[in-house]
Amino acid sequence: MLKLKKLVATALAGVMMAVAAGCGGGAADSGSSAPAGNSGGKRVGVAMPTQSSQRWIQDGANMKEKLEALGYQVDLQYAEDDVQAQVSQIENMITNGANCLVVASIDSSALVNALAQAKANNIPVIAYDRLLMDTDSVSYYATFDNKGVGTLIGKYVEKQLGLAEGKGPYNVEFFAGSPDDNNAHFLNDGLFEVLQKYIDKGQLVVPSKQTDFDTICTLRWSQETAQRRMEDIISGYYTDGKKLDAVISPFDGISYGIAAALEGAGYQVGKNWPLITGQDAELMATKNIISGKQTMTVFKDTRTLADKCVTMVQAVLEGKDPEINDTTSYNNHKLVVPSYLCTPVAVDKSNYQKELIDSGYYKADQLK
Protein backbone atom coordinates (compact mmCIF):
# COMPACT_ATOMS: atom_id res chain seq x y z
CA MET A 1 0.00 0.00 0.00
CA LEU A 2 2.48 2.64 1.14
CA LYS A 3 5.80 3.13 -0.64
CA LEU A 4 7.68 5.66 1.51
CA LYS A 5 11.01 4.16 2.53
CA LYS A 6 11.60 6.79 5.19
CA LEU A 7 8.29 5.96 6.83
CA VAL A 8 9.10 2.27 6.88
CA ALA A 9 12.52 2.98 8.36
CA THR A 10 10.95 5.05 11.13
CA ALA A 11 8.35 2.40 11.79
CA LEU A 12 10.99 -0.27 12.18
CA ALA A 13 12.45 1.52 15.20
CA GLY A 14 9.49 0.35 17.22
CA VAL A 15 9.14 -3.11 15.72
CA MET A 16 11.01 -6.15 16.98
CA MET A 17 12.27 -7.44 13.68
CA ALA A 18 14.87 -6.35 11.14
CA VAL A 19 13.50 -6.26 7.65
CA ALA A 20 14.37 -4.24 4.61
CA ALA A 21 12.19 -1.30 3.71
CA GLY A 22 10.89 -0.65 0.24
CA CYS A 23 8.77 -2.48 -2.26
CA GLY A 24 8.71 -4.22 -5.60
CA GLY A 25 11.21 -6.94 -6.43
CA GLY A 26 11.01 -10.33 -4.82
CA ALA A 27 8.98 -11.40 -1.83
CA ALA A 28 10.57 -11.40 1.60
CA ASP A 29 11.33 -14.44 3.75
CA SER A 30 11.34 -13.72 7.48
CA GLY A 31 10.94 -17.34 8.53
CA SER A 32 12.65 -18.82 11.56
CA SER A 33 12.14 -21.59 14.04
CA ALA A 34 11.84 -21.68 17.82
CA PRO A 35 12.40 -24.45 20.35
CA ALA A 36 9.37 -26.58 20.95
CA GLY A 37 7.46 -26.01 24.17
CA ASN A 38 3.93 -27.12 24.91
CA SER A 39 3.29 -26.69 21.20
CA GLY A 40 5.03 -29.97 20.44
CA GLY A 41 7.13 -28.21 17.81
CA LYS A 42 4.21 -27.55 15.49
CA ARG A 43 4.75 -25.20 12.57
CA VAL A 44 2.66 -22.12 11.75
CA GLY A 45 2.82 -20.42 8.36
CA VAL A 46 2.08 -16.68 8.44
CA ALA A 47 1.46 -15.09 5.02
CA MET A 48 1.46 -11.27 5.07
CA PRO A 49 0.76 -9.04 2.05
CA THR A 50 3.56 -6.45 2.10
CA GLN A 51 6.29 -4.73 4.08
CA SER A 52 5.53 -1.39 2.42
CA SER A 53 2.97 -0.53 5.10
CA GLN A 54 3.96 -0.06 8.73
CA ARG A 55 0.96 -1.94 10.09
CA TRP A 56 1.77 -5.21 8.27
CA ILE A 57 5.34 -5.11 9.55
CA GLN A 58 3.98 -4.76 13.07
CA ASP A 59 1.35 -7.46 12.56
CA GLY A 60 3.91 -9.97 11.36
CA ALA A 61 6.43 -9.13 14.06
CA ASN A 62 3.84 -9.32 16.84
CA MET A 63 2.51 -12.70 15.75
CA LYS A 64 5.93 -14.20 15.17
CA GLU A 65 7.12 -13.12 18.60
CA LYS A 66 4.03 -14.40 20.40
CA LEU A 67 3.86 -17.71 18.53
CA GLU A 68 7.54 -18.42 19.10
CA ALA A 69 7.10 -17.63 22.80
CA LEU A 70 4.59 -20.49 22.88
CA GLY A 71 7.13 -22.80 21.26
CA TYR A 72 5.77 -22.86 17.72
CA GLN A 73 8.00 -22.80 14.67
CA VAL A 74 7.03 -19.79 12.56
CA ASP A 75 7.41 -19.34 8.82
CA LEU A 76 6.67 -15.62 8.27
CA GLN A 77 6.51 -14.49 4.63
CA TYR A 78 5.77 -11.17 2.94
CA ALA A 79 4.66 -11.21 -0.71
CA GLU A 80 5.18 -7.48 -1.45
CA ASP A 81 1.70 -7.18 -2.99
CA ASP A 82 2.54 -9.82 -5.61
CA VAL A 83 -0.44 -12.18 -5.74
CA GLN A 84 1.40 -15.05 -7.41
CA ALA A 85 4.24 -14.73 -4.92
CA GLN A 86 1.75 -15.15 -2.09
CA VAL A 87 0.25 -18.21 -3.76
CA SER A 88 3.72 -19.74 -4.03
CA GLN A 89 4.54 -18.89 -0.43
CA ILE A 90 1.40 -20.59 0.85
CA GLU A 91 2.01 -23.66 -1.30
CA ASN A 92 5.56 -23.86 0.07
CA MET A 93 4.29 -23.57 3.63
CA ILE A 94 2.00 -26.53 2.99
CA THR A 95 4.83 -28.54 1.40
CA ASN A 96 7.13 -27.71 4.33
CA GLY A 97 4.72 -29.18 6.85
CA ALA A 98 2.73 -26.27 8.25
CA ASN A 99 0.19 -27.37 10.85
CA CYS A 100 -1.80 -24.12 10.63
CA LEU A 101 -1.88 -21.16 8.23
CA VAL A 102 -2.54 -17.51 9.05
CA VAL A 103 -3.23 -15.52 5.88
CA ALA A 104 -3.61 -11.79 5.28
CA SER A 105 -4.38 -11.87 1.58
CA ILE A 106 -3.41 -9.46 -1.18
CA ASP A 107 -6.35 -10.41 -3.39
CA SER A 108 -9.09 -11.96 -1.29
CA SER A 109 -10.30 -14.27 -4.08
CA ALA A 110 -6.95 -15.32 -5.58
CA LEU A 111 -5.97 -18.03 -3.10
CA VAL A 112 -8.77 -20.53 -3.68
CA ASN A 113 -6.59 -23.28 -5.18
CA ALA A 114 -3.76 -22.87 -2.68
CA LEU A 115 -6.20 -22.98 0.22
CA ALA A 116 -7.85 -26.08 -1.23
CA GLN A 117 -4.46 -27.76 -0.91
CA ALA A 118 -4.42 -26.79 2.76
CA LYS A 119 -7.85 -28.28 3.29
CA ALA A 120 -6.85 -31.48 1.50
CA ASN A 121 -3.96 -31.77 3.96
CA ASN A 122 -6.20 -31.04 6.98
CA ILE A 123 -4.43 -27.76 7.67
CA PRO A 124 -6.68 -25.18 9.37
CA VAL A 125 -6.62 -21.68 7.86
CA ILE A 126 -7.22 -18.47 9.79
CA ALA A 127 -7.94 -15.35 7.74
CA TYR A 128 -6.12 -12.39 9.26
CA ASP A 129 -7.82 -8.98 9.00
CA ARG A 130 -8.78 -9.57 5.34
CA LEU A 131 -11.52 -12.09 4.70
CA LEU A 132 -10.62 -14.92 2.33
CA MET A 133 -13.33 -15.03 -0.31
CA ASP A 134 -14.89 -17.75 -2.47
CA THR A 135 -13.40 -20.65 -0.51
CA ASP A 136 -14.67 -23.23 1.96
CA SER A 137 -11.11 -23.85 3.14
CA VAL A 138 -11.02 -21.05 5.72
CA SER A 139 -11.75 -22.02 9.32
CA TYR A 140 -11.83 -18.73 11.22
CA TYR A 141 -11.40 -14.99 10.76
CA ALA A 142 -9.64 -12.55 13.12
CA THR A 143 -10.22 -8.90 12.30
CA PHE A 144 -11.46 -5.54 13.46
CA ASP A 145 -15.05 -4.45 13.01
CA ASN A 146 -14.47 -3.16 9.49
CA LYS A 147 -17.94 -1.77 9.03
CA GLY A 148 -17.45 -0.15 12.42
CA VAL A 149 -14.32 1.56 11.08
CA GLY A 150 -16.43 3.20 8.38
CA THR A 151 -19.04 4.14 10.95
CA LEU A 152 -16.38 5.75 13.17
CA ILE A 153 -15.10 7.83 10.26
CA GLY A 154 -18.62 8.84 9.27
CA LYS A 155 -19.61 9.76 12.83
CA TYR A 156 -16.43 11.79 13.25
CA VAL A 157 -17.16 13.78 10.09
CA GLU A 158 -20.78 14.20 11.15
CA LYS A 159 -19.70 15.67 14.49
CA GLN A 160 -16.86 17.85 13.23
CA LEU A 161 -19.00 19.45 10.53
CA GLY A 162 -22.09 19.76 12.71
CA LEU A 163 -24.19 17.84 10.22
CA ALA A 164 -26.65 16.54 12.81
CA GLU A 165 -27.37 20.17 13.72
CA GLY A 166 -28.15 21.00 10.11
CA LYS A 167 -24.92 22.81 9.24
CA GLY A 168 -23.66 22.99 5.68
CA PRO A 169 -23.44 22.83 2.77
CA TYR A 170 -19.87 21.51 2.68
CA ASN A 171 -17.88 20.42 -0.35
CA VAL A 172 -16.43 16.93 0.16
CA GLU A 173 -14.69 14.22 -1.86
CA PHE A 174 -14.57 10.49 -1.14
CA PHE A 175 -11.92 7.79 -1.46
CA ALA A 176 -12.36 4.07 -0.85
CA GLY A 177 -9.98 1.15 -0.44
CA SER A 178 -8.96 -1.63 -2.80
CA PRO A 179 -11.79 -3.39 -4.66
CA ASP A 180 -10.18 -6.80 -4.13
CA ASP A 181 -10.13 -6.33 -0.34
CA ASN A 182 -13.45 -7.21 1.27
CA ASN A 183 -12.67 -4.85 4.16
CA ALA A 184 -12.88 -1.90 1.78
CA HIS A 185 -16.49 -2.73 0.98
CA PHE A 186 -17.49 -3.15 4.63
CA LEU A 187 -15.81 0.14 5.55
CA ASN A 188 -17.47 1.99 2.70
CA ASP A 189 -20.87 0.60 3.68
CA GLY A 190 -20.43 1.80 7.26
CA LEU A 191 -19.29 5.22 6.11
CA PHE A 192 -22.18 5.88 3.74
CA GLU A 193 -24.75 4.56 6.21
CA VAL A 194 -23.81 7.62 8.26
CA LEU A 195 -23.18 10.22 5.55
CA GLN A 196 -25.49 9.37 2.64
CA LYS A 197 -28.46 11.14 4.24
CA TYR A 198 -26.48 14.37 4.39
CA ILE A 199 -25.64 14.06 0.70
CA ASP A 200 -29.33 13.52 -0.01
CA LYS A 201 -30.23 16.60 2.05
CA GLY A 202 -27.63 18.75 0.30
CA GLN A 203 -25.57 19.35 3.43
CA LEU A 204 -22.69 17.45 1.84
CA VAL A 205 -22.01 18.37 -1.77
CA VAL A 206 -19.66 16.32 -3.94
CA PRO A 207 -18.55 18.60 -6.81
CA SER A 208 -16.92 15.69 -8.68
CA LYS A 209 -20.13 13.65 -8.24
CA GLN A 210 -17.86 10.66 -7.55
CA THR A 211 -19.49 8.61 -4.80
CA ASP A 212 -20.03 5.08 -6.13
CA PHE A 213 -17.52 2.51 -4.93
CA ASP A 214 -16.24 1.54 -8.38
CA THR A 215 -15.25 5.16 -9.02
CA ILE A 216 -13.74 6.06 -5.66
CA CYS A 217 -11.93 2.78 -4.94
CA THR A 218 -8.11 2.73 -4.84
CA LEU A 219 -6.43 -0.46 -6.09
CA ARG A 220 -4.01 -1.92 -3.52
CA TRP A 221 -4.80 1.08 -1.29
CA SER A 222 -2.08 2.87 -3.27
CA GLN A 223 -0.81 6.28 -2.15
CA GLU A 224 0.34 7.12 -5.66
CA THR A 225 -3.01 6.21 -7.21
CA ALA A 226 -4.80 8.32 -4.61
CA GLN A 227 -2.51 11.28 -5.25
CA ARG A 228 -3.15 11.17 -9.00
CA ARG A 229 -6.91 10.99 -8.50
CA MET A 230 -6.85 13.86 -5.99
CA GLU A 231 -4.82 15.94 -8.43
CA ASP A 232 -7.43 15.27 -11.12
CA ILE A 233 -10.26 16.22 -8.76
CA ILE A 234 -8.57 19.49 -7.80
CA SER A 235 -7.82 20.46 -11.40
CA GLY A 236 -11.24 19.40 -12.60
CA TYR A 237 -13.52 20.84 -9.92
CA TYR A 238 -11.70 23.29 -7.65
CA THR A 239 -9.84 25.73 -9.91
CA ASP A 240 -12.58 28.37 -9.66
CA GLY A 241 -11.93 29.14 -6.00
CA LYS A 242 -14.45 26.61 -4.72
CA LYS A 243 -13.65 25.63 -1.13
CA LEU A 244 -12.83 22.01 -0.35
CA ASP A 245 -14.05 21.29 3.17
CA ALA A 246 -13.30 17.60 3.64
CA VAL A 247 -11.69 14.60 1.96
CA ILE A 248 -12.86 11.28 3.32
CA SER A 249 -10.02 8.76 3.19
CA PRO A 250 -10.20 5.14 4.41
CA PHE A 251 -6.46 4.64 5.03
CA ASP A 252 -3.49 6.70 6.17
CA GLY A 253 -1.48 5.83 3.05
CA ILE A 254 -4.25 7.18 0.84
CA SER A 255 -4.35 10.27 3.07
CA TYR A 256 -0.65 10.91 2.37
CA GLY A 257 -1.39 10.94 -1.35
CA ILE A 258 -4.31 13.30 -0.84
CA ALA A 259 -2.15 15.63 1.25
CA ALA A 260 0.63 15.61 -1.35
CA ALA A 261 -1.85 16.57 -4.08
CA LEU A 262 -3.23 19.39 -1.94
CA GLU A 263 0.24 20.73 -1.18
CA GLY A 264 1.10 20.59 -4.86
CA ALA A 265 -1.97 22.68 -5.63
CA GLY A 266 -1.05 25.32 -3.05
CA TYR A 267 -3.32 24.36 -0.17
CA GLN A 268 -1.91 25.30 3.25
CA VAL A 269 -2.51 23.91 6.72
CA GLY A 270 -4.27 26.48 8.87
CA LYS A 271 -5.59 28.40 5.89
CA ASN A 272 -7.58 26.47 3.31
CA TRP A 273 -6.67 22.91 4.35
CA PRO A 274 -9.62 20.49 4.44
CA LEU A 275 -10.55 17.92 7.05
CA ILE A 276 -8.82 14.63 6.12
CA THR A 277 -9.62 11.25 7.66
CA GLY A 278 -7.62 8.02 7.69
CA GLN A 279 -7.15 4.57 9.18
CA ASP A 280 -4.38 2.58 10.91
CA ALA A 281 -2.78 5.29 13.10
CA GLU A 282 0.53 4.93 11.29
CA LEU A 283 3.46 6.85 12.75
CA MET A 284 3.53 9.37 9.90
CA ALA A 285 -0.23 9.84 10.12
CA THR A 286 0.02 10.52 13.84
CA LYS A 287 2.70 13.12 13.19
CA ASN A 288 0.45 14.64 10.54
CA ILE A 289 -2.42 14.79 13.03
CA ILE A 290 -0.20 16.65 15.48
CA SER A 291 0.87 19.11 12.75
CA GLY A 292 -2.64 19.53 11.34
CA LYS A 293 -2.02 17.90 8.00
CA GLN A 294 -4.42 15.04 8.82
CA THR A 295 -7.46 15.46 11.05
CA MET A 296 -8.09 11.95 12.34
CA THR A 297 -7.32 8.29 11.92
CA VAL A 298 -8.83 5.05 13.15
CA PHE A 299 -6.55 3.18 15.54
CA LYS A 300 -6.63 -0.58 15.17
CA ASP A 301 -4.29 -1.89 17.84
CA THR A 302 -2.39 -4.59 15.99
CA ARG A 303 -1.14 -5.97 19.31
CA THR A 304 -4.72 -6.85 20.22
CA LEU A 305 -5.40 -8.45 16.85
CA ALA A 306 -2.16 -10.44 16.97
CA ASP A 307 -3.01 -11.64 20.48
CA LYS A 308 -6.43 -12.80 19.37
CA CYS A 309 -5.08 -14.58 16.30
CA VAL A 310 -2.39 -16.33 18.33
CA THR A 311 -4.98 -17.62 20.81
CA MET A 312 -7.00 -18.86 17.83
CA VAL A 313 -3.98 -20.72 16.46
CA GLN A 314 -3.26 -22.23 19.86
CA ALA A 315 -6.85 -23.37 20.36
CA VAL A 316 -7.10 -24.90 16.89
CA LEU A 317 -3.82 -26.79 17.23
CA GLU A 318 -4.89 -28.09 20.64
CA GLY A 319 -8.17 -29.34 19.20
CA LYS A 320 -10.26 -26.71 20.99
CA ASP A 321 -12.83 -24.19 19.74
CA PRO A 322 -11.42 -20.64 19.67
CA GLU A 323 -13.35 -17.71 21.11
CA ILE A 324 -15.74 -16.23 18.53
CA ASN A 325 -17.99 -13.17 18.80
CA ASP A 326 -19.54 -13.00 15.32
CA THR A 327 -21.16 -15.85 13.40
CA THR A 328 -23.35 -13.86 10.98
CA SER A 329 -21.50 -10.96 9.33
CA TYR A 330 -18.76 -12.44 7.16
CA ASN A 331 -20.13 -14.50 4.29
CA ASN A 332 -17.37 -15.25 1.78
CA HIS A 333 -19.78 -16.63 -0.87
CA LYS A 334 -19.07 -20.19 0.27
CA LEU A 335 -19.77 -20.05 3.99
CA VAL A 336 -20.26 -17.66 6.89
CA VAL A 337 -16.83 -17.60 8.50
CA PRO A 338 -16.80 -17.69 12.33
CA SER A 339 -15.05 -14.49 13.37
CA TYR A 340 -13.64 -12.51 16.24
CA LEU A 341 -13.98 -8.74 15.84
CA CYS A 342 -11.70 -6.39 17.75
CA THR A 343 -12.85 -2.83 18.46
CA PRO A 344 -11.32 0.16 16.61
CA VAL A 345 -10.94 3.66 18.12
CA ALA A 346 -11.10 7.09 16.48
CA VAL A 347 -7.96 9.15 17.19
CA ASP A 348 -7.32 12.84 16.64
CA LYS A 349 -5.28 15.61 18.27
CA SER A 350 -7.45 15.45 21.40
CA ASN A 351 -6.74 11.83 22.35
CA TYR A 352 -3.63 10.57 20.54
CA GLN A 353 -1.62 10.89 23.77
CA LYS A 354 -3.97 8.57 25.64
CA GLU A 355 -4.59 6.04 22.87
CA LEU A 356 -1.17 5.84 21.24
CA ILE A 357 1.46 6.94 23.76
CA ASP A 358 0.00 6.10 27.16
CA SER A 359 -0.97 2.66 25.82
CA GLY A 360 2.64 2.02 24.80
CA TYR A 361 1.87 1.71 21.09
CA TYR A 362 4.31 4.53 20.35
CA LYS A 363 6.94 6.27 22.44
CA ALA A 364 6.69 10.03 22.78
CA ASP A 365 10.08 10.59 21.17
CA GLN A 366 8.93 8.75 18.03
CA LEU A 367 6.44 11.55 17.41
CA LYS A 368 8.96 14.39 17.60
Where are each of the predicted segments found?
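Sec-dependent signal peptide recognition
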Residues: 5-13
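C-terminal motif of bacterial Sec signal peptides marking the signal peptidase cleavage site
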Residues: 18-22
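A residue-level marker of the well-folded mature domains of exported/periplasmic proteins
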Residues: 2-6, 23-368
